[in-house]
Amino acid sequence: MSYLRPSLVMLILLTLITGIAYPLLTTGLSQLLFSGAANGSLLYQGDKVVGSALIGQNFTKPEYFWGRPSATADSAYNAMASAGSNLAATNPALDKAIAERAAQLRQANPAMKGPIPVDLLTASGSGLDPQISLAAAQYQLARVAAARQLAPEQITKLIDESTDQATPNFMGESVVNVLKLNLALDALK
């Protein structure tokens, strides 16, 4: 019985600290210091939320840049089903999926004769990547420029503005946020 009171006091104290004080402190600090990120890095078109800079979206029209293939099975970029494809490099299903994606990309981008950037052929670990490499954006440049009847130089400028530079440079490659780029293209209308 002598242990009951200190145990209850400790339970109440730790519940207040870890269940109320700590969450309120971290939420308050994140809202104060990083409000955009704390609220999901939402992107707007006018007053309407159109997505998050952290989650890819499925673009298939020729006038838009396409992101990485999604590994989510039921529907593309379904965050509830986020997972990698888990196909081994020797799996025939992976070879078939890559061949189908390559054929689709070659058909959609007939002006491009070189190799297709790997991030346009393979799904990411999460299946939800919002970015593509600069090479993947440049691979699609001619198709998007023709579909929108814009000068390639004008779109190249938008690609540069939508590029997140690797910091520091040796920590990876620069990437292009596909949703930001497509929103910038829509803003040109």
From Swiss-Prot:
InterPro entries: KdpC. The chain crosses the membrane at residues 8-28. It is found in: Cell inner membrane. Keywords: ATP-binding, Cell inner membrane, Cell membrane, Ion transport, Membrane, Nucleotide-binding, Potassium, Potassium transport, Transmembrane, Transmembrane helix, Transport. It comes from the Bacteria. GO terms for cellular component: plasma membrane. Its main location: membrane. GO terms for molecular function: ATP binding; P-type potassium transmembrane transporter activity. It is a single-pass membrane protein. The keyword ATP-binding applies. It holds the Pfam family KdpC. The system is composed of three essential subunits: KdpA, KdpB and KdpC. Part of the high-affinity ATP-driven potassium transport (or Kdp) system, which catalyzes the hydrolysis of ATP coupled with the electrogenic transport of potassium into the cytoplasm. This subunit acts as a catalytic chaperone that increases the ATP-binding affinity of the ATP-hydrolyzing subunit KdpB by the formation of a transient KdpB/KdpC/ATP ternary complex. Belongs to the KdpC family. This is Potassium-transporting ATPase KdpC subunit.
